[in-house]
Amino acid sequence: MKKFISVLLALILICGSAFTAGVYAQEDKSEICFAVASDVHYVTPAKTATSTPYNEGVETTFKSGKDSLYNQSGFIIDEFLDQCAKNPECRFVLITGDIATHGRDFASEHEAVAAKFRKFEQETGKQVYVINGNHDSALNCAVGREDFISIYHEFGYDKAVSVDENTCSYSVNLNDEYTLVALDTCDERYRVVPNNDLSRMNWAVTQIRNAKREGRKVIMIMHHNLLEHNPYQKALEKNYVVDTPYSFAGLLADLGVKLVFSGHTHVTSATSYTSFLGNTIYDFSMPSLGNFPAEYKLFKMTDSEIKYETKKIEHIDADKLAEVCKGYSKKDIALMKNDFQQYTWNRSHAVYSEKIRKDISPETIGIKESSALYGKLKLVTDGLRELSDTPIYGENGIQTMAAAYGLEIPNSSYSTLNEALTTAYLTYKSGRRIYSQDSDDFKLIVKLIAFSIRKSAAEAADGDVLFDANAFLRELGYSGTVADNILKEFSKKYGFATPEEKAALSLAFALFGGFCSDTDGVENRDGSIPGYGVKEAAQNRFAAAFEKILIKIIEIIKKFYPIFNQFFEKSI
């Protein structure tokens, strides 16, 4: 029996040494440094500052929002490339899609950007590599797959080891050590990521395996996120994350891919996933270069460590912009020349503030008019819009009014609900702050919504505006169990008991909850992760699960064969 026990223990130790070998690093090779940008969104400038391409006769299949930096986009690209040119460490540039806002409709926009890339390469000798996004090409549009590849042939395709015959995907050797696999994640309709497109995945896997056989490390670029970057992103934000993200990510991780760069969301975020075998892959969702926050990332890699830093577009050539596009005020020109980050914040804050002021409705949250919840929810969202710009504090503020309804509104630095929501959204997009579920910001928003519900109930003809919180969350895409767990978890933290507060909690989660659970430990803006030469501990799941199974076997043997207990006790 002791021999049997020894065998069991040996198995555990063997698995422990095989799967929990810890972390070791190979000898560092030379550092490689490169820049990554996404969602450049170039647009041909309008004739005047107050105009847009659309009211100047441009007809397109896709319009961007009012916060888009239409007229500034070309000058932002110039400044970005200038920074890369002046950085002696930066060896190449990666662009992860949405290069031109109207790219699938006007080849001229792509050609303008390609000319800038070409000039950069000729002057610096540094290579640019691109992949398409949903704005860049589409079936039955002016710019399709072959057109995109033709325009950008110099930027990855000409030197490619392989180009997928059905998509814009390609693989190319960056140097003697690294291979880039650029994966087209757009389908022919341009908006939806591949629906279980096995041929596309198989092509990528083949490229990775070929690179590995040659002793190369693989990094990847794609437009849509490989992983979910906030809770239930795939359920709530359609067409933002690749299909079957975790099975695909696990496969890539086990093939040795550690770095993936994506975009599309315009959100500065980084997250990771560890496969069943214990291999970790990182998905860096890039900020938008051509919209708020007008930023990109710089990566420095050695075998032992990968460091990354978010870089800002601090200024553009606003004098040249004013020559092309008339009507900018002296104040705006000065701000674009000296503090472009503040200019983009001001512009986006104004746009999103107005959007929140006008657009809080059941439809924008995701509830259709045909829903049984629609009527009650509309009374609440109408009330929120009315309260949007009401001062929270002061003699006639919401805090005072809420007290009359038995609700305590906590103190904060925000002046209005609109300011709280707008600031939270933009801060989240830039990755500058991670909001927790315990944050004062979230508590404040829940309480303000609870007041709106209670006030709406008091003013409604029948006094019935309450909607079922679980039904609401389920209709947004959460499962019944998940909906229950969300409410239980939040209710425990805040001590919510009233039906109004639970309804408010579910609505606050729909508006704000996606900002509140970035707990993966990967820094969004600046940080470091283990390099490709580091083998991270692979015990995570396999060895832990195996050890649990062996312990269970021992427990069963001890239970049904008590005579063997003494052997286990002496041996363990």
Go through the PLM ranges and name each one.
Residues 15-28:
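Sec-dependent signal peptide cleavage junction
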Residues 2, 26-29, 318-572:
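Non-catalytic terminal accessory segments
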Residues 26-107:
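N-terminal active-site segment of His-dependent metallophosphoesterases
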Residues 108-203, 209, 277-285, 298, ...:
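Extended active-site neighborhood of metal-dependent phosphoesterases/phosphodiesterases
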Residues 43-46, 101-104, 132-141, 188-191, ...:
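Active-site environment of divalent metal-dependent phosphoester hydrolases
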Residues 26-35, 44-49, 167-182, 213, ...:
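Beta-strand-turn-beta hairpins that frame and shape the catalytic cleft
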